[in-house]
Amino acid sequence: MKLSVYIILSILFISTVFYEIQFTEARQLRKTDDQDHDDHHFTVGYTDDFGPTSPGNSPGIGHKMKENEENAGGYKDDFEPTTPGHSPGVGHAVKNNEPNA
């Protein structure tokens, strides 16, 4: 019983000692005069947060998005699948089937 009381008191003492220590390697930043944010009150409801939109088509709000008219065929060579077990450029040599001249 006495041993468990000593263990609990030791844990509480150690935790109170290390409570104020910051375990970080980051540099502590100083507060400058230009960055004094104490006088600003951040509250919800500023009227300048969002500007009104013009009437008409608002994509994403009940209207369809504008279709992307890019030609997907122009990008068909961007990805070429490889056979299983061979990934050229990732530690493997590129196999060349042409005979050496």
UniProtKB/Swiss-Prot annotation:
UniProtKB keywords: Apoplast, Developmental protein, Hormone, Hydroxylation, Secreted, Signal
Protein function: Extracellular signaling peptide that represses primary root growth rate. Modulates leaf morphology. Regulates systemic nitrogen (N)-demand signaling. Mediates up-regulation of genes involved in N uptake and assimilation pathways.
The UniProt record lists the keyword Secreted: yes
GO BP annotations, alphabetical order: cellular response to nitrogen starvation; nitrate import; regulation of leaf morphogenesis; regulation of root development; root development
Family: Belongs to the C-terminally encoded plant signaling peptide (CEP) family.
Signal sequence extent: 1-26
Modified residues (Hydroxyproline): 52, 55, 59, 81, 84, 88
The keyword Secreted belongs to this UniProt entry's keyword annotation: yes
One term of GO molecular function: hormone activity
Bias kind Basic and acidic residues: ranges: 29-42, 64-79
Induction profile: Triggered by nitrogen depletion.
The protein, known as: Precursor of CEP6
GO cellular component terms, A-Z: apoplast
Tissues expressing the protein: Expressed in lateral root primordia and in lateral roots excluding the meristem region. Also present in the aerial tissues, such as leaf petioles and the shoot apex region.
Residues of the propeptide: 27-48, 64-77, 93-101
Post-translational modification summary for this protein: The mature small signaling peptide is generated by proteolytic processing of the longer precursor.
Region (Disordered): 29-101
Domain of life: Eukaryota
Subunit: Interacts with CEP receptors (e.g. CEPR1 and CEPR2).
